[in-house]
Amino acid sequence: MEITYDKEADAMYIEFRKGKFSKNKKIDDFTIIDLDEKENILGIEFLDVSKRIPLESLKEINLKNLI
């Protein structure tokens, strides 16, 4: 898993797996899911992140109980 933030685009992307992109699904005006050919989720893009999440909170991300 990889989380990236593009300051210029004000977009955050959470990549769950590598794979060949096939299509995306728009969830709302700020959330897009990328899918592979079998409709497995490759990642999720969040737009206008700074308007929805305090950027200070992106500096420290804790991952707990993933496995």
Label each residue range with its predicted role.
Residues 1-67:
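Small, basic N-terminal interaction modules of short regulatory proteins
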